[in-house]
């Protein structure tokens, strides 16, 4: 579960490496974000020459969490890190590649574009 001040890895090639959650979107009582939720993040670490700079504020879609997700058949999928994909104002991915696996639950949230960019779908 991701909350304010959580540090996350960036799973795309936008140029950012680490970001910090500054707001969880989705209502006044939405305190934590889970897999597939959109949050507002600030870039804390970026590579030189990338599309984003340190201090920039973007939306991000969470694609991997340490908490994981429970499937309807009872199986659980957990990851070693919390990771997200940066989104622009139109909720489209900034990067052109997504590194690492993503889950099938993103299809239900209408993020098929990110699933097609990913290396592996679990």
UniProtKB/Swiss-Prot annotation:
Part of the 50S ribosomal subunit. Forms a cluster with proteins L3 and L19. In the 70S ribosome, L14 and L19 interact and together make contacts with the 16S rRNA in bridges B5 and B8. It comes from Rickettsia rickettsii (strain Sheila Smith). GO terms for cellular component: cytosolic large ribosomal subunit. GO terms for biological process: translation. Binds to 23S rRNA. Forms part of two intersubunit bridges in the 70S ribosome. Pfam families: Ribosomal_L14 (PF00238). Belongs to the universal ribosomal protein uL14 family. InterPro entries: Ribosomal_uL14, Ribosomal_uL14_bac-type, Ribosomal_uL14_CS, Ribosomal_uL14_sf. Keywords: Ribonucleoprotein, Ribosomal protein, RNA-binding, rRNA-binding. One of its GO terms (molecular function) is large ribosomal subunit rRNA binding. This is Large ribosomal subunit protein uL14.
